[in-house]
Curated annotation (Swiss-Prot):
Taxonomic lineage from the root: Bacteria, Pseudomonadati, Pseudomonadota, Gammaproteobacteria, Enterobacterales
Source organism superkingdom: Bacteria
GO cellular component, one term: cytosol
Stated name of the protein: UPF0301 protein YqgE
NCBIfam families recorded: PRK00228.1-1 (NF001266)
Family: Belongs to the UPF0301 (AlgH) family.
Species assigned in the record: Escherichia coli O127:H6 (strain E2348/69 / EPEC)
Length: 187
């Protein structure tokens, strides 16, 4: 089972404050473990424009049709001071990893310098921090009914309103997450 370019959808019984009702986009999954970014937990009072200001990045030439008032996500509980930018191609930045044909993760400053300009990737999600699982840990959490999994959908990742991502990600696999009981069993 390789869950790279999949969503983890928190089951209703998962009450951890960071992961409760979360959707995690899995960026890497292999025999050593998994790494992902929570894509539906906006940080309070932090927008992309605020990140650019803190880093003293001024988009030039500024394309006013590109909104920089989008929220920055809490990507996970690890390295909350590090930025992770999920975006559509191109992937010609200094530190980019291609996750799928249509999704790239970049951690270098050069992608931030394109935000708000005509060089910006068409779809962008900025997060601080990430989530990771050790070898076998994620698989066990799935067996323990902590998560549903679904192939990632770019509309949900980049365009769906943040408040709807948890419900809409579950709908990808035919589940109405809002009507699920808080406790699941095994058949």
């Amino acid at each position: 089972m390789n869950l790279q370019h999949h969503f983890l959808i928190a089951m209703p019984a998962l009450q951890d404050p960071i992961f409760r009702r979360s959707v995690v986009y899995i960026c890497e999954h292999n025999t050593n473990g998994a790494m992902g970014i929570i894509v539906n937990k906006p940080l309070e009072n932090l927008k992309i424009e605020g990140i650019l200001e803190k880093l003293k990045i001024t988009p030039e030439p500024r394309d006013e049709s590109i909104r920089l008032d989008k929220p920055v996500m809490l990507g996970g509980p690890l390295a909350e001071d590090r930025g992770f930018i999920l975006h559509t191609p191109p992937s010609n930045f200094a530190s980019s990893i291609r996750i799928s044909d249509n999704t790239v993760m970049t951690t270098s400053r050069d992608v931030l310098e394109t935000l708000g300009t005509d060089k910006q990737p068409s779809d962008v999600l900025v997060a601080l921090g990430y989530a990771s699982w050790e070898k076998g840990q994620l698989e066990q959490e799935i067996l323990d009914n902590a998560w549903l999994t679904a192939p990632a959908d770019l509309n949900i990742l980049f365009k769906t309103p943040i408040a709807d991502r948890w419900r809409d990600a579950a709908k990808l696999i035919g589940v109405d997450i809002l009507t699920m009981p808080g406790v699941a069993g095994h058949a």
